[in-house]
């Protein structure tokens, strides 16, 4: 490939931009192509002259390195590099209709320029450059110039500040107050607290007085140790008084193993009677279903209430003194009134 060094090369990138320059180096291992005296001719109608169309750039770059993945087409031209002109449309629109755009720069062009000669590229005074001889009206875009736009942002943009201030002056009434204050506060330099003062002592530090405080604390520790020793000594003297079994109350109580705690049920019954009364000695039957009996005596309604004992049979023997009649439900008969002035003797209450 050395026979092609110095030949005029026409290279079309994946973004449809055409670059023309002299072949400087080809690295087959890294897959790179290096051109010198490179000019960008733009897309030359490959975008159908629409809004994405990129127009020629008059800037000449000393050296540009292209990666193989960035190259779409490459051809060798026999013509002189100065005789090659970009393809421009016959009817160019006026310069006022083109949007403001940044100059198109080839990939890695700026890096190579800094390494070799660092050429100074003149910046246009207006957003739309004037017509270039042989190139027609040139209006580059900013969609494919990330590197150039970043470098432009690093320089102070006086024109953008003036335009923003004009727009802010027009729309000042509609702009929120907090945004105005935010813009003002962001431009102010940070202020330091000048009223802050540090108290600086005029005298030297007194080490003797501070050491005396520590020695005083040591004396208090000695006194505390003496108090603890005296308290321990008194406790030792009190331990000499042994336990007296004769005068102790708990030694007279017998243990459960010496006497038999199993009492007969008669003794337990008598103990319950003495403690809880006669009601505790009554037998308690809890068998249900064997029988049910009520023996009630009502005299003038209210002398006695319900009182009875549930036994093993069911029988009702009732005596009512209201009407003077004796009724026995088991006999199923009734006697005339006033026949008995007193209840019969055979009635059990």
Swiss-Prot record:
Modified residues (Asymmetric dimethylarginine): 288, 294, 298, 306, 310
Biased composition (Polar residues): 144-164, 186-195, 322-349
Residues bearing PTM N-acetylserine: 2
Residues modified as Omega-N-methylarginine: 306, 310
Motif (TFG box): 260-280
Entries under InterPro entries matching the protein: DFDF, FDF_dom, FFD_box, Lsm14-like_N, LSM_dom_sf, Sm, TFG_box
GO terms for MF: eukaryotic initiation factor 4G binding; mRNA binding
Biased composition (Low complexity): 89-113, 311-321
Name of the protein in its database record: Protein SCD6
Organism expressing this protein natively: Saccharomyces cerevisiae (strain ATCC 204508 / S288c) (Baker's yeast)
């Amino acid at each position: 490939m050395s026979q092609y060094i110095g030949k005029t090369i026409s290279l079309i990138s994946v973004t449809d931009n055409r670059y023309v320059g002299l072949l400087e180096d080809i690295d087959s291992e890294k897959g790179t192509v290096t051109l010198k005296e490179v000019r960008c001719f733009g897309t030359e109608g490959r975008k159908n002259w629409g809004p994405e169309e990129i127009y020629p750039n008059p800037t000449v770059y000393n050296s540009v390195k292209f990666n193989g993945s960035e190259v779409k087409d490459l051809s060798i031209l026999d013509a002189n590099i100065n005789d090659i002109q970009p393809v421009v449309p016959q009817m160019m629109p006026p310069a006022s209709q083109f949007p403001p755009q940044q100059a198109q720069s080839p990939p890695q062009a700026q890096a190579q320029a800094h390494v070799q000669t660092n050429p100074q590229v003149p910046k246009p005074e207006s957003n739309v450059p004037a017509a270039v001889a042989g190139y027609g009206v040139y209006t580059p875009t900013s969609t494919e110039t990330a590197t150039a736009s970043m470098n432009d942002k690093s320089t102070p943009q006086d024109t953008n500040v003036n335009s923003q201030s004009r727009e802010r002056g027009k729309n000042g009434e509609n702009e929120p107050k907090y945004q105005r204050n935010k813009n003002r506060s962001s431009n102010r330099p940070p202020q330091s607290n000048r009223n802050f003062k540090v108290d600086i002592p005029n005298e030297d530090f007194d080490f003797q007085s501070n050491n005396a405080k520590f020695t005083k604390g040591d004396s208090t520790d000695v006194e505390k140790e003496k108090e603890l020793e005296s308290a321990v000594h008194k406790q030792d003297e009190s331990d000499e008084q042994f336990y007296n079994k004769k005068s102790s109350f708990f030694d007279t109580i017998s243990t459960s193993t010496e006497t038999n705690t199993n009492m007969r049920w008669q003794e337990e019954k008598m103990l319950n009677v003495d403690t809880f009364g006669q009601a505790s000695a009554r037998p308690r039957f809890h068998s249900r279903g064997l029988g049910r009996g009520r023996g009630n005596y009502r005299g003038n309604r209210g002398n006695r209430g319900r009182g009875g004992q549930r036994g093993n049979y069911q029988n009702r023997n009732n005596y009512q003194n209201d009407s003077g009649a004796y009724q026995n439900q088991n006999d199923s008969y009734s006697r005339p009134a006033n026949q008995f002035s007193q209840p019969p003797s055979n009635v059990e209450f």
